[in-house]
Amino acid sequence: MTVDTITSTSNGNQDVPKEFLPIEFETQLLHLGRFPDILGSCAVPVYSSAAFEFNSVAHGARLLNLTQFGNIYSRFTNPTVNVLQNRLAGLEGGVAACGVASGSAAVVVTVMALTGVGDNFVSSFHVHAGTFHQFDSLAKQMGIECRFVKSRDPADFAAAIDDKTKFVWLETISNPGNVILDLEAVSTVCHTKGIPLICDNTFGCAGYFCRPIDHGVDIVVHSATKWIGGHGTTVGGIIVDGGTFDWGQHPDRFPQFHDPRTRLWERFSRRAFAVRCQFEILRDTGSTLSAPAAQQLLVGLESLAVRCERHAQNAAKIADWLREYPLVAWVSYVGHPNHPDHQGALKYLKRGFGSVICFGLRGGFEAGALFCDALKMVITTTNLGDAKTLILHPASTTHEHFSSEHRAEAGVTDDMIRLSVGIEQIKDIKADFEQAFKQVLRGKKSLRKPCIGKILMQDEINEDLFGPSACRT
């Protein structure tokens, strides 16, 4: 549950003293939160158990009353997930974390933990399309108002806050617009108004590039599906409690932490928000991160530093190369001095500038779509943060349902291509781009996307599964 207090070994029922905490980030990725397994497993075991045995009736009562932390039921407590939570809390500089089923679940659980019917919250307009839809539609269905701020000016965030506002939400680097807001300035606004600042740090890669809590952010969320897992195999989300917001100073605004039945602030202090997420919201909604998924994410974390170093190196080189290519109209990369938020990148990012580049082709919408279809190795998909290079044409996919005015305000132009640079040999990435550029110049449209090796078309897949007659009409 927490970095400071761990009350579970492999069976979840014994206290373990904190004997050694690795100091360096790269070492923490492999060892933080791991405790000896009674069977000697070197890897974090997968505890695929729905429930966990109580030592006694009294022990069960202590666990359910949260007077002792331990494993109860895998909907909201599991030893494998617990290791992931501890590791990510430590990497982000927080005091506790809550693992959930996906990045979208992390958003919903966070909103539900802090708001109720009639409340509102403020969000940057520059957020992931899925998050925007959750805030604009799902929150509205729950009787909660989201107030979007389109500018970068902290004063505009301040102007949107009233006595029913429960938090401000932003992204470290916005997806896909590559906008970087001034975390410290917005944090000052929030704390002056008595509300926490929440940051989606998915692009910050679990603290490798950015640790928002070091800059005044109170709560961090991730889509762990992306760079944390790093291989496109597992969906998951994480919520990290920075332990920095004083819920005790604002009992009227946040009564859920002062309910006389649970007394979260009185009992758990700096960890009150994480406890509410895990033992109240997650318990009641069941947005559960499974033990196998948690182990997959832990395996991914072990190589995160090595991957992110290569991601950043490749991205910087590809951005420079694209900028010189005649067919490319523009390039948006926060590591370049001409990016409008480059100073923010220098202030808040370390070890590199991430691995996401946006660029546009001369020829607009059609050229962008044709380019994506012509690629042979690079994969067209909605995902990000994979070890493999991924690409997307947002205007025809993730942002297709938005109006042209909305897309323009979000910086999603018709020609925009979002590129998540992988860790392949950069010569191969360039070679695939070059052959696709040539097809765009020739105006040649590929009806079926080629791939390295043989691919099965849908009728071939059906035939393999059901026999030749099953796919004939």
Swiss-Prot record:
Q: Which domain of life is it from?
A: Eukaryota
Q: Encoded by which gene?
A: lolC2
One GO molecular function term of this record is: cysteine synthase activity
Transmembrane segments annotated in the record for this chain: none
**Cross-referenced PROSITE patterns:** CYS_MET_METAB_PP (PS00868)
Kindly list the biological process annotations in GO that this record carries.
Answer: alkaloid metabolic process; cysteine biosynthetic process from serine; L-homocysteine biosynthetic process; transsulfuration
Cofactor(s) needed, names only, are: pyridoxal 5'-phosphate
The Swiss-Prot or TrEMBL record describes its family as follows: Belongs to the trans-sulfuration enzymes family.
Q: Pathway of this protein? A: Alkaloid biosynthesis
At which residues is N6-(pyridoxal phosphate)lysine found?
K226
Q: How is it used?
A: Loline alkaloids show broad-spectrum anti-insect activity, and different lolines may have different biological activities. In vitro tests of NFL, NAL, NML, and semisynthetic loline derivatives with long carbon-chain acylations on the 1-amine have shown that many are effective against both fall armyworm larvae and European corn borer larvae, but the effects seem to differ depending on the modifications. N-Formylloline reduces the weight gain of fall armyworms by deterring feeding, and does not significantly affect corn borers.
Q: What is this protein called?
A: Sulfhydrylase-like protein lolC2
What phenotype is described for loss of this gene? Significantly decreases loline-alkaloid production.
Q: Which organism is it from?
A: Epichloe uncinata (Endophyte fungus)
Signals that turn on the gene = Expression is induced in loline alkaloid-producing cultures as well as in planta.
Its GO CC terms are:
cytoplasm
E.C. number(s) listed in UniProt: 2.5.1.-
Which residues, if any, are the signal sequence?
none
Which UniProt key words apply to this protein? Alkaloid metabolism, Pyridoxal phosphate, Transferase
Purpose of the protein: Sulfhydrylase-like protein; part of the gene cluster that mediates the biosynthesis of loline alkaloids, potent insecticidal agents composed of a pyrrolizidine ring system and an uncommon ether bridge linking carbons 2 and 7. Lolines are structurally differentiated by the various modifications of the L-amino group and include norloline, loline, N-methylloline, N-acetylloline, N-acetylnorloline, and N-formylloline.
